[in-house]
């Protein structure tokens, strides 16, 4: 087998990196960032080769044949449960700078707003891009990103829309809860829940309510379009200051909460505001997260909804290699 040597690492013909000092130890290089407090782990190399011509096909291939890589990258003991992974791949579409597959501790994401901001900031850190407009390929479509001189990134997300309005759900212990179903790159159930309180001290109570609500959605067959699972719950309350328009708490698919205001969740919120006539096209909506970070959102009208733009900033916070020791019983995560 052909091997290319780089320092203490050998790159096998299959593209997988292994330590020259310990050939049984595989290495996967990564860069960590956070966007508004929510981590993104960009995987630079080391995953098995994916051969499908489409990005959706590559997601299916990764899920069916190599899912243990996802579990290891985003789960204990190599990561915390809130880590979102972003597998960096060559672009599929002409003009794109990269393709990205997003995933977390339980599965795969069609799109991730904070993650896309993290990917663009990471590409700048690596010297692959400079300020300006760039596009990345995601499983749900092309996402256009503007990297600004101050380090912030504005992403023009995939089209968003409200699917159903004022949907009643019976939630055990909480009675009837009314909310909207909207698509912002992922499926959301959005609820005005200010009565639960929106300080950091209320996080445990918000978590209990959001989990109970999501369980009720599943039991009662409340879904997105074409029966799609609603795997995100987004609760809204009053912001901490009049500088912002709203504060949110977002329950993610892995039953952890988003530290950022959630890019796809803010996109879904903008779709609902637009449908209700509460936010004009081009106007700025400042969405605060439960930990106090802020995204700026706006939209332009589209044929079947809106095209949202979300602006935030990511910060680099780690760089290295994940090590996979064949003698480690948890090398692929605690499963």
Describe each PLM feature range:
Residues 12-24:
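Short, Lys/Arg-enriched N-terminal segments with co-localized hydrophobic residues
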């Amino acid at each position: 087998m052909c091997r290319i040597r780089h320092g203490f690492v050998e790159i096998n013909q299959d593209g997988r990196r292994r330590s020259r000092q310990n050939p049984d130890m595989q290495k996967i290089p990564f860069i960590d960032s956070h966007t508004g407090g929510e981590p993104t782990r960009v995987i630079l190399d080391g995953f098995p080769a994916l051969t499908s011509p489409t990005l959706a096909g590559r997601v299916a291939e990764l899920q069916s044949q190599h899912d243990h890589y996802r579990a290891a990258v985003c789960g204990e003991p190599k990561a915390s449960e809130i880590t979102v992974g972003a597998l960096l791949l060559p672009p599929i579409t002409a003009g794109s700078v990269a393709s990205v597959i997003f995933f977390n501790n339980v599965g795969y994401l069609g799109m991730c707003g904070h993650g896309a901001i993290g990917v663009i900031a990471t590409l700048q850190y690596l010297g692959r891009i400079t300020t300006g407009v760039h596009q990345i390929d995601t499983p749900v479509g092309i996402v256009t990103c503007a990297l600004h001189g101050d380090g912030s990134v504005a992403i023009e997300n995939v089209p968003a829309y409200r699917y159903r309005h004022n949907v009643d759900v019976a939630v055990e212990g909480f009675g009837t809860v009314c909310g909207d179903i909207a698509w912002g790159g992922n499926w959301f159930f959005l609820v005005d829940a200010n009565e639960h309180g929106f300080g950091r001290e209320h996080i445990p109570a918000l978590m209990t309510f959001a989990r109970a609500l999501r369980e009720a959605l599943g039991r009662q067959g409340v879904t997105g379009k074409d029966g799609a699972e609603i795997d995100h719950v987004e609760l809204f309350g009053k912001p901490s200051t009049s500088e912002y328009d709203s504060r949110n708490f977002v329950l993610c698919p892995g039953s952890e909460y988003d530290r950022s205001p959630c890019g796809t969740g803010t996109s879904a919120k903008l779709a609902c505001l637009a449908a209700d006539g509460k936010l004009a096209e081009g106007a700025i909506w400042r969405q605060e997260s439960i930990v106090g970070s802020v995204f700026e959102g706006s939209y332009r009208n589209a044929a079947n909804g809106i095209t949202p733009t979300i602006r935030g900033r990511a910060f680099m916070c780690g760089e290295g290699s994940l090590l996979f020791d064949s003698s480690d019983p948890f090398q692929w995560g605690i499963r």
